[in-house]
Amino acid sequence: MAFDSKKPTAQMLGRWQPWHDGHTALFKKALAETGQVCIMVRDVGGIVGEDAGGGRTASQDDNPFRFNEVRQNIVDGLAKHGYHEGMEYVIMQVPNIVDISYGRSVGYTFTQHDLGKEVHDISATKIRAEMRRSGILDFMGS
């Protein structure tokens, strides 16, 4: 069945620099909540950490992948598990969101999934370092 924007949808917001098995595990949990997921990609490609005020940073220090690369990494990663863009999920680029504010019950929840130590130990920082060491990713980007 095709993605239906009117149906209840789980949201995943992140940098996805790069998409990895931990993100896929989170996607599966989110998908189980509603049957479809909107993956939002923060517009941080190429940005080096900046002050966003209030002790937050607008981005972390290492964002080598641009939106089109992130999108393709997500599509490729989820295809390995039988998921298809436009069916179980959609991907959209969003501004560099650093805060989500709300005033009262607004009809949705925030859910933090415990994915276990093995998944939580997956590090995109270490993945990027290995990609650079092996020559897949240069130090100026991808």
Model-derived regions, located:
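Nucleotidyltransferase catalytic core that binds NTPs
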Residues: M1-S142
